[in-house]
Amino acid sequence: MSIFAGKTLMITGGTGSFGNAVLNRFLRTDIGEIRIFSRDEKKQDDMRHEYQAKYPDVANKIKFFIGDVRDLQSCRNAMPGVDYIFHAAALKQVPSCEFFPMEAVKTNVIGTDHVLTAAIEAGVGAVICLSTDKAAYPINAMGITKAIEEKIAVAKSRYSGKTKICCTRYGNVMCSRGSVIPLWIDQIRNGNPITLTEPKMTRFIMSLEEAVDLVLFAFEHGQNGDILVQKAPACTIQTQAEAVCELFGGKKEDIKVIGIRHGEKMYETLLTKEECAKAEDMGNFYRVPADNRGLNYDKFFKEGDTKRAEIEEFNSDNTYRLNLQETKAKIGALEYIKKELSGEGNFVQ
């Protein structure tokens, strides 16, 4: 963590699952300060008390800023002294964004523009924007707004001065706030049907720790304008539900198929065919560099890419597919699941 020694890191949307994972990873390191920037004072107060109890000797490294990425001035107010930013603030629930698309635009699109504008003005060293697989070939409002977020990040990276701007794309982060596994656990414990949308639907899966690893990889190895993804495995929703049933004593016959929700796909894409054609293989990750050609139309129309026709997209149907036992092992290794199985219960990320 020496690259963060004495530095100030700001996390937008910092009271969420990702912000908690970063705090647990960083607080006992030599980092100077972590700023939690968010709009919910109750969540900030809960977080303040939690970390004062958990890490009393280092909790003073956490500083809380009430603000909203939708408001440029509140972003500017939080920037003085910030060295790096992890931009995690987002509206991410697919059905909610379908019904309120302009709210998704305000947070995911305009909010990102505000954060990046304020960061560039303040001379912040690096901003890592957290995106989603739903931004590739988007069909729903959440994915479309996150795709525009990425476009804004790449566009601003061309004129960002000393500020490095990168994006990371995630699949499903297991047991993050609003995800399905905690819902299934509650359904099993309450004796209710275990609801899933479509058994054959596939999703990339990763842990919160892997989510933090991806952001740190982008921070250390990404170049200005890059999009970085992890080579994540996938599983079907049916396999995931059965794994949770086996871990928590649920009955597979209690699984109830309720149908695909508003805006959902049968499978998700982490890299499009076009992105795969120029992606750099970096071991456990892919790096997609920005297309930094200018608006020289003659050159733009004459430069082609034959490689594009020879390659597939990277999606949750053609990546490595976890079987039931592999899925169960991956879920069972999560800290959230360990605490739930130990009887502590109601463990909130």
PLM ranges: what are they?
Residues 30-43:
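Conserved glycine-rich Rossmann-like NAD(P)H-binding loop of the short-chain dehydrogenase/reductase
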Residues 12, 79-88, 129:
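Rossmann-fold scaffold of SDR-type NAD(P)-dependent oxidoreductases
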Residues 7-29:
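N-terminal Rossmann NAD(P)H-binding glycine-rich loop of SDR-like oxidoreductase domains
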Residues 63-84:
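Conserved Rossmann-fold cofactor-binding substructure of NAD(P)-dependent oxidoreductases
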Residues 64, 104, 165-168:
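Hydrophobic/aromatic anchor residues within beta-strands of the central parallel beta-sheet
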